[in-house]
Amino acid sequence: MLFSLRNFISYSNLYLYKNVCIGGQLLLNQDEILKKMEEWPKHYNPKEIEEKWQKIWLSEEYWRDVFRFRDEDDKAPRFVIDTPPPFTSGELHMGHAYWVTIADTIGRFKRLEGYNVLLPQGWDTQGLPTELKVQYKLGIPKDNRQLFLQKCIEWTEEMIKKMKEAMIRLGYRPEWERFEYKTYEPKYRKIIQKSLIDMYKMNLIEMREGPVIWCPKCETALAQSEVGYLEKEGILAYIKFPLKEGGEIVIATTRPELLAATQAIAVNPMDERYKNLVGKIALVPIFNIEVKIISDADVEKEFGTGAVMISTYGDPQDIKWQLKYNLPIKVIVDEKGRIINTNGILDGLKIEQARNKMIELLKTKGYLVKVEKIKHNVLSHVERSDCLSPVEFLVKKQIYIKVLDKKQKLLEEYKKMKFKPARMSYYLEDWIKSIEWDWNITRQRIYGTPLPFWYCENGHLVPAKEEDLPIDPIKTSPPLEKCPLCGSELKPVTDVADVWIDSSVTVLYLTKFYEDKNVFNRTFPASLRLQGTDIIRTWLFYTFFRTLMLANNVPFTTVLVNGQVLGPDGTRMSKSKGNVVSPLDRVNDFGADAIRMALLDASIGDDFPFKWDIVKGKKMLLQKLWNASRLVYPFIAKQRLDKPKSLHIVDKWILQEHKKFVTKAINAYENYDFYLVLQELYNYFWEIVADEYLEMIKHRLFDDDNSAKYTIQRIIRDIIILLHPIAPHITEEIYSRLFGHKKSVLLEELPKVDDIEENKRIDELGEVIKKTNSLIRSEKIKNRLSMNTPVSVKLYASKQVIELINEVKDDVMKTLKVTNLELIESNEEKVEIKTANQSMGV
């Protein structure tokens, strides 16, 4: 039921000129009350109010008194949140808006709960996407390394500015003043490099030569966590390999362009078709290379012909076989994805071109049996959605962090972290179990953290001096003239670090692991890691692994993993689908608070569609709260009302409902079930407080009834406090107008409800009130009468119900404009109404 101001204050001529004492002032009539209400705008203007409070929150005064993490405070419990440092793309998408809202909500709730909260915000600044923007959009060549780096930093700062403004517009208030960090800055870079040197000293880092995952499109090495299988269209070529002693064997391959790198043919030892061929020599067609036929249990008999070629390297299985059988290595793909070392047959061609040409050559020479078009899984660069290109395996000298021999320890230690939802722990466990490679941390890029090492031709590493950090080996002389192990000349490592090296030390940076052991001991492990499902195997795993190695403990006690925000059609947002929604598209129409509420309206960990209709519904709820606050404003504003010795029975009922709401809401917050907070708020505030209770107490408010005034003030204040973490702007505004005892809601405490007595009979009374009101309203609607039309009512109900109604008969009558209420005992509950003869209102 929508509030009407005039209906609220004119329910009866009896009260038209009633003197009402409000806040020490005498309001003589409804005109005075109307005038008082006009101090409060009728319509909630989210843009105006939100921008006002965002400016206030950013003031030095509010930072100092409300949002500052108090390093000196040894009494209050600490709550440290490790928030995601987003890559500085410049666009704050809906996924960013989601975790920003979650982080801000948790930070605000924990402050209300009495915690000393550290809510930081960093920026993951370095990496390939920025390089590509600078290289192609700005036209800056990579040849001039210094200029290129400078332009990358300028671009980064420009993007940070845009994203930060968008975050602030959504009401996000981390501690920008002291805990905003950028991964390219010297202070942070020093921590990165120090952590790498420490891991080197722990014998966890080494340089070695071998096959690496390589993205020809991005021209850099990759880690296992950055690749995955994508279904793509391809071919399966059936090729005849002549046998040296006569005869032939037909193999099936998806990579005929790698024939020149073939080192063996493999068949399954249980495959009767090829048992007599194992150990024989076959000739690679076109290239006439002699290779041995071997048997291996990993060959799938059902795939193709059951015979496969082993090349260096077509896929991860080729690498395993090469190591297992100590096969020769021949590299025929370069860093740009072009064919080399084929005696000019395919040299210079890109992979796809070489594949097509090889098919034609095999066909011409009579070696091609057939070609099938297939769909198959291809290992690709999936960590970057704007790449998704197939990867190759090149032989390179790279720097690795040893992970494989720590897998068992990792599988034991991860259980010390609590996951929300609990099922997310299995994603991390499965990833740890699936790791097959050590972590290649070198990237052949420019805009990244320099690896603080020099190396010699034998692959020995020499770390920088810690007092020289942060350093760039390209610009700095090595700490020694020669390699201390072999006496060879030292060269700087020119590659930069994997970007996950940067972001995997966020916890160590925030808790001052290297700077202040006292602070570290009081803030580590962090209380909470907040992140999405898509970076469990990267940011979560690498932070967990590195922190465990360096600090000998898990990085955080709880991991909160949110799902993905989908397009309105329920599919992943994509520009090609046209279903991309920006959080700022309609923020001025509906407000940041309504957007935040819509984003938190799903269970943590679940994917959900974002729809503006849901946002619109949330704004309606906020307008309802605004209206209710405005309506009670003349009666309770800025008053300190003590609990009366005796409460009206209707007030006792609503306080029992209030106790249930407060208890459920706080419990939901504690469990990060924000959707339950909103669900309980709607059920309690909209359906009970606004639609029932406010209607029932208005006559008592005009009577200056302390029980009604105390109760509604307590209810509104507690609702404001409990809604504040999710909808901070409107709650600050209402609080400042209605209460204002403190400069911010955040300086209040969570509501306490232990003093509210619980009585089963009063609960029953409440249910009877709601049902009776509903019956009378329904009859009025059925008879096309307005809610303000005076009526006579006959209510048929059981003896028990009648006894309860008699306790609140006067309240029911005044609430629903009932001039005469006749209670008739009956087994059937129903209502009969007729229009009253006398006027009941203005």
Curated annotation (Swiss-Prot):
Q: Which CDD domains match?
A: Anticodon_Ia_Val, ValRS_core
According to its UniProt record, which protein family does this protein belong to?
A: Belongs to the class-I aminoacyl-tRNA synthetase family. ValS type 2 subfamily.
Top enzyme category: ligase
Read off the domain note.
ValRS has two distinct active sites: one for aminoacylation and one for editing. The misactivated threonine is translocated from the active site to the editing site.
Q: Which biological processes are named by the entry's GO terms?
A: valyl-tRNA aminoacylation
**Which PROSITE patterns does this one have?**
AA_TRNA_LIGASE_I (PS00178)
> What are this entry's molecular-function GO terms?
aminoacyl-tRNA deacylase activity; ATP binding; valine-tRNA ligase activity
Keyword check for Transport? no
Write down the superkingdom of origin. Answer: Archaea
Name under which the protein is recorded: Valine--tRNA ligase
> Motif location ('HIGH' region)?
86-96
Q: Name one GO cellular component term.
A: cytosol
Q: Which reaction equations make up its catalytic activity?
A: tRNA(Val) + L-valine + ATP = L-valyl-tRNA(Val) + AMP + diphosphate
Binding annotation for ATP: 575
Which species is this record about?
Answer: Saccharolobus solfataricus (strain ATCC 35092 / DSM 1617 / JCM 11322 / P2) (Sulfolobus solfataricus)
Q: Which InterPro entries match?
A: aa-tRNA-synth_I_CS, aa-tRNA-synth_Ia, Anticodon_Ia_Val, M/V/L/I-tRNA-synth_anticd-bd, Rossmann-like_a/b/a_fold, tRNAsynth_Ia_anticodon-bd, Val/Leu/Ile-tRNA-synth_edit, Valine-tRNA_ligase_type_2
Q: Does the keyword Cytoplasm apply?
A: yes
Q: What is its main location?
A: cytoplasm
EC numbers: 6.1.1.9
Which positions does the motif 'KMSKS' region occupy?
A: 572-576
| Subcellular localization(s) per the UniProt record | Cytoplasm
What gene name is listed for this protein?
Answer: valS
Alphabetized, the UniProt keywords read: Aminoacyl-tRNA synthetase, ATP-binding, Cytoplasm, Ligase, Nucleotide-binding, Protein biosynthesis
Described by its record, this protein's role is as follows: Catalyzes the attachment of valine to tRNA(Val). As ValRS can inadvertently accommodate and process structurally similar amino acids such as threonine, to avoid such errors, it has a 'posttransfer' editing activity that hydrolyzes mischarged Thr-tRNA(Val) in a tRNA-dependent manner.
